[in-house]
Amino acid sequence: MADLKDILLDKLREARAGVVASLDGLGEYDARRPITATGTNLLGLVKHLVGVEHVYLGESFGRTPPDVLPWVADGSIWQNADMWATADESREHLLALYERAWAHSDATVAALDLDAPGSVPHWPAERRATTLGFLLVRMVEETGHHAGHADICRELIDGRSRSGNDEFGADWWREYVATVQRAADAFGPGSS
C-alpha cells in the first residue's frame, strides 16, 4: 500500500494537471477573459494557485519560494490581483511560475514528515500553527476546488471538459440537457 504522503501528493499532481489542461488549445483571449459573474478566469486560477503553493508548501515551513510574486510584494493580492492575468503576464510566464511552485512544493513535501510543524503567516494567530499534513490536505482541496472551477469555465467557453464528455456527441448532450431542463421546469414558475 502506498504511503499517505505519496497518495496526497499524487492527488495534488492530478489536480494541478487538470488546471493546466483546461488551457489546452485556447487562445489568449479565452484563457484570460472572465467567465463567471465574479470574474473567474482560467489564467487567474493558475496565478492564484502559484501564490497558494508558495505560502502553504513553502513559506509556512521557512522555505523561501523560487520567485518573488509582484502581486504579493506590493500587497495587491488583497484586492484580488492574484485572480487575473495582466496584459504583461503571458500564459507561458504564469505556467512557468506554476511549474516552479510545484517543484518547490514537492521538495518541501519530500523533505518533511507529515507532522512537521508549520505556521501560515496570514492566518489569525490562534490558528497559525499547523502541520505539513494539514497543509498538504488543504492544498489538495484548494487545487481540486479550482480544477473544478477550471473545468466548468472551459465547458462554458467551448463545451470541452476534462471529464470526458466528448465521447457521447453533441446530439446526446442536447437531449440530456433537455431532459434535465424538463425535470427542472416541473418546479419552475407556476408549479405547485
Regions found by a protein language model. Give the residues of each.
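Short, helix-capping/interhelical loops that line the mouth of catalytic, cofactor-
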Residues: 1-7, 52-108, 115-120, 156-192
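Short, solvent-exposed segments of well-ordered alpha helices
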Residues: 3-6, 10, 36, 40, ...
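Extended alpha-helical regions
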Residues: 5, 9, 14-22, 30, ...
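Alpha-helical transition-metal enzyme core signature, strongest for iron centers
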Residues: 12-19, 42-57, 84, 88-91, ...
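Helix-loop segments that flank and shape redox-cofactor active sites
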Residues: 17-41, 59, 63-71, 80, ...
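Conserved catalytic core of Hanks-type protein kinase domains
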Residues: 25, 48-49, 111, 138-139, ...
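Generic helix-packing signal
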Residues: 35, 109, 151-154
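A contiguous, mid-protein "functional segment" used to position or interact
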Residues: 130-171
